[in-house]
Structure formats: structure tokens, C-alpha cells
Amino acid sequence: MGSMSTPAASANGGQVLLLPFPAAQGHTNPMLQFGRRLAYHGLRPTLVTTRYVLSTTPPPGDPFRVAAISDGFDDASGMAALPDPGEYLRTLEAHGARTLAELLLSEARAGRPARVLVYDPHLPWARRVARAAGVATAAFLSQPCAVDLIYGEVCARRLALPVTPTDARGLYARGVLGVELGPDDVPPFVAAPELTPAFCEQSIEQFAGLEDDDDVLVNSFSDLEPKEAAYMESTWRAKTIGPSLPSFYLDDGRLRSNTAYGFNLFRSTVPCMEWLDKQPPRSVVLVSYGTVSTFDVAKLEELGNGLCNSGKPFLWVVRSNEEHKLSVQLRKKCEKRGLIVPFCPQLEVLAHKATGCFLSHCGWNSTLEAIVNGVPLVAMPHWADQPTISKYVESLWGMGVRVQLDKSGILQREEVERCIREVMDGDRKEDYRRNATRLMKKAKESMQEGGSSDKNIAEFAAKYSN
């Protein structure tokens, strides 16, 4: 049966359950920040995740309670135990649906009925369980509107697999997308579904039954994706509620103490902030490619040499499970100008005055963090939504450039060096900075009192407060 911690919040409003995809940092943190906003409006947020995650990760603290469900692997990481994603998802559904139903029942019997379940639509079974228990549901989409709507169009059979650049041009011509997507820009899960069939199915199935949800929420803001957000709202009733980041970085005085996500699957004690303090303003390249993507030895070698050859000081995040791939020679070369760490407080680093550029995989959370801090990007996408986001960064938002692979699909150090120099020293460096600053202001306005996303959050909270 699902278990519950001691209450952390003092609000007397209705209980909101938050169910992100288990052990996915990029899905959990935005939902937690949304929960903090709901707590400000008087609701009582409860984080629901797997027993294994709760046993290995410190709880987020006030204003959250925590509740546990099972993915069938209470004593081990499910994704590690079942590396086949399709098999893990089936196991997660079987155990998760049962224990979520038990949790909803036990909470109701204890006099704490859930008013609404905010869930990740990568877990569509959660909607069915909640509705069977008489609990309202709100789907929380954690990717940009541009990518979401492509998945939605496939689910609605208005687009067929594989999705082609011609299909994307049709969306652009209709005014649905703000930029024309080429062969390297269409989300790869639907552009080449045969390569990752489980992820393709999971992405599309987010939209199956979405019309049955009471609310649909998107972690974006209308000024960033005006055409896409408008289409999402007219087609799926989706409301933008982002960027869902700690309010300290949004200059929102209503939640002054909200300075961190508060739920970290990765930890580090490396003093990178002290190192940053010693660097000149806007001189440092932050390099991080997320918590999921992996590089082979050759790619790391090219990336590292490109960084060193750029002549810029750099902070390079190489996860501990990737560190062994770095050669001794490359480590010594990096020591001259850079600092290699297994983890860094990314938001803090991006907000630091020394940071001048972010070389990123362009996952959605990392991109929003760069936008909120006005930091130009060098995009080096890997999969999922990243190629599409990279296209928007370079061609529509004008806040950076994209690293191009050679004709054989190989990363070359010269290209890494070229892109860093272009953003940091090139003729358009002031354009990149100006565009990043413009979007930063728009992002903050959307989340400050009376902004577009803030209004949507307030309306959602009011709906479930009575």
C-alpha cells in the first residue's frame, strides 16, 4: 500500500498529488516547482514517487508531504534492473496502478482526499486510476509546445509515422510552428520510430485520452512559443504554467526563500562556485549534457579538445559514471583552463556573473534555465526533444548556435571550438546576448504576479481550493 510521511505544509486547502515519471530529474523538478506555487495559493502538495526513489533521495521538505507507490523494484533501480524501456514501463504500470489506487483510497479514508492528481502523461494509467477513484486529473507536459503538438498530431492521426520535414513544413505553413523544421530538427522519436519504438509509443500515447483530463498544463510560456501555445490551447485546452523554476531566479518576491529545486538525484561537494568567483565576467563556458545522455570515448575526446582549443575557461560536468572515459592526456590538457566536476548546481552556475555561454544538450529544463538567466547557448542535441529545441534556439530565438556533425555523423573538435568562439567572440555575440536577455525578461514577466503563466496557475489553484 502507498505510504505517507508526516505533513510538511501548514495550509488547510485541498490536497494535490504530484506524480512525475520516477527517477527522472527533468520531470520531477518542474512539477515540484508547480507544487510550490500551488502551496502559495493555499493548496497542500504531496509528491508521489517510487519507494526506491524515496529511499535513496532526501525528501524535498516544506511544503511537501511525500507518498510512495511501487514500480515493482522497491530495493533497486527499476530502470537499471530492466534496461529494456518497454519492459520497465509495463512493470511500472502493473505495480504503479495498483499501489496508486491503494494510496488514493487510504488518503480518502484518513480524511485527506486528493482533490486532483497532477501526473506525467508518460504514465497514462495514472489518469485511469484517479478517475476510477473519483479524483480529478491534470496532465503535466514537461516538454515544449512545439514538440508536444507534433506528438499530439500523430496521436490524433493528423500526421502519420514517420513524421517528415514535409509534414513539419505543413505545420509551419498553417502557422502552428514558429519555425520550419528540417531533417535534423523533427523529434527523432517520431522521425525514426523504428530506432526507439518504446519511446516513440510512450511519447505519442501522452495524448491518448488527454481530452478526458480536467486540465492540461505545459511547462512553457506563451511569449516564448506564441503560435505553438495558442494551438495547444485551442486543440487540447492546454495552459502554459512555466518556466517552472525556483522563483528566486524569476525575481518573484512572493516566494523569496525558493532558491533551489529541493530534490536532487545527483549530489556533489565539489567547490565549483569558488572557482567561478575567480573568473572574469562572462568568460566561462558551462558544459553539461544532462543526467541521461552518454558519450563514447571518441566523442568525449573531441568535445574536450574543442573546449581546450577555444581558449576559454570552462566548467565541464562529466558524470561519475562517465569519468573513466576521459584519457589522462585530456585531463591534463583540461587542467590548464578548465575544471571538471561530476555535478554542479546548474542554476547557480548559470546565474553567476562569470558564466558567458552554456554548451548544452538543450534538454527543455536546461534551455529554460539558460533563458531565465539570459545565457547564450551552444546547442549539441542528442535525442528526444533536443534537436527541435536546438533549432528554435538558433533559428527563431537567436540566442545561440548549433554544433554540426560531419558528413559521417561524427563530432569534430574544430566545430566545437568554432561554435564557442562564435558565441563568445564572434560578430553576432552581442545579438545572442541581447536576444537571451530579451527572453529572460519575458520569462520572468510570465511568472510574476499577473503574468500569463501566473494567471493560469492562480486559476488552477482556485479551481481546486473549494
Swiss-Prot record:
Changing residue 27 to N: Loss of activity. GO terms for biological process: detoxification. InterPro entries: UDP_glucos_trans, UDP_glycos_trans_CS. It is an enzyme of class 2 (transferase). GO terms for molecular function: nucleotide binding; quercetin 3-O-glucosyltransferase activity; quercetin 7-O-glucosyltransferase activity; UDP-glycosyltransferase activity. GO terms for cellular component: cytoplasm. UDP-alpha-D-glucose binds at residues 27, 142, 291, 343-344, 361, 364-366, 369, 385-386. Keywords: Detoxification, Glycosyltransferase, Nucleotide-binding, Transferase. Pfam families: UDPGT (PF00201). Its EC number is 2.4.1.-. Induction: Induced by exposition to gamma ray. Changing residue 291 to A/V: Loss of activity. UDP binds at residues 291, 343-344, 361, 365-366, 369. The active site is at 27 (proton acceptor), 120 (charge relay). PANTHER family: GLUCOSYL/GLUCURONOSYL TRANSFERASES (PTHR11926), UDP-GLYCOSYLTRANSFERASE 79 (PTHR11926:SF732). Belongs to the UDP-glycosyltransferase family. This is UDP-glycosyltransferase 79. The lineage of its organism: Eukaryota, Viridiplantae, Streptophyta, Embryophyta, Tracheophyta.
